[in-house]
């Protein structure tokens, strides 16, 4: 089963259709197909919070399983009516002016004769400036300035860390933690041993028991740094445990404030499930609150002004792209299939949450289309299709020839044609940016994905429960991460020659770790709902089979430990020094992993997650930020 299948949202009538609307009758994608409106409903299997399993006998006499998924919740008329004043050219002119002013701020920090620099806090100023533009999602405008600042900071870096300024001899926890995180993320060689030098005689991070704002900020940056850990870095594990405990205790003692908001956000989303656009939106609110309290300096106010304007200009582009996505979804004929989930708006929210570069529209649109196709295939293989039908479809995908649809049942013909045409169209578009035909790469990934799906369908059909290792290896392919990443990545304006592709696609460690995280995390959040739909095999059930006497809690603990270790491995694959494969070539695939992980963050029930996802769509796509 694919884990790239966003969960349902709670209803909100002013924005999208009511859950109580009547079930759509299946219509033809090519010709009339089996309709569930005439099916005889069977006895429901145990319900799973917001979706259960219903058996239905179609009018051709075939008994089918359907997931009782609700229809699309985001009304197409509402989406097509979206508008924004920030499309006007005057806003672009203002943006360019502000970009120039922020560059001047960066340059003043680097002035040899001092400028705004103070020898007691210049290193912290450089790092704070870089941190601000990155968290606000505007760093793409300042790559040259960021490198100058980080080169300057790194020139003072030592095995004991750094002080807040070039003339400060004593190591400063806040500056060292912030510096370690940013430098490591930008590919500089830094070692976690710097934190050993910040311990007291008892082997603990030295800090007072008082929760002062300055100390809390230092521990917050220590926590953020600890999340960029590599395997085997024990001091980073210690720092994470210590800082997380400290911050949770601090939340109990400090008043509700911008600082408490920042702590709550970082604790909730950490690094591996953080969406950059959601972080930008949240950090804008935090800095805005500081502005009201007159806690911001003039430079940060200028950066904030640019961030708000950039957010809203991209918001206007989001509206256009979302309209395009909605038209594609509608024209595909998928709205008439009532056995599939319709999550194109949620998928768009995810991808626009990880890539806010205006020129990457084709990447975002390709990602949404591919993820929606994955969801259609997931629902077809996991529930609706019979095993004989799925064997025919699997063979047709391998042949990659529309003439093979003659042997498919009617509902599969339409699915196949949309899949075939969409993938071919995207491959043709990708050839413009890659300078070569990439279709074979994508076909190989698609065949592996469909093959893994088919194996799981055979397991469901026969009632077979595999071993953990057998399930996990197959599950990495069926997670959908590889196929969801590969085709959209080719649409970027970044060349991906074969030697780079080998480092991010199958069978690279990078691809293996990303697929592993999605499969493991998806199973911990969805295994109960999957079992309710008749899908017994999961990481949890297979672990319990391999370890008689173990409980679900034992299985979850084991899998959560696997996830934590695999995240560290993926961090290392992203950030390891490699002159042949720059970080920028791996960043989109890594961010897709983070984005997909976000949708399974702390998810133990669809009701809570529904509200969270709904709010995410509204906050990052539908609503502009107040100016």
From Swiss-Prot:
It is an enzyme of class 4 (lyase). Binds 3 Mg(2+) or Mn(2+) ions per subunit. Mg(2+) 3 binds at residue 530. Mg(2+) 2 binds at residues 378, 382. Its EC number is 4.2.3.107. Expressed only in resistant trees, not detected in genomic DNA of susceptible trees. This is Carene synthase 2, chloroplastic.
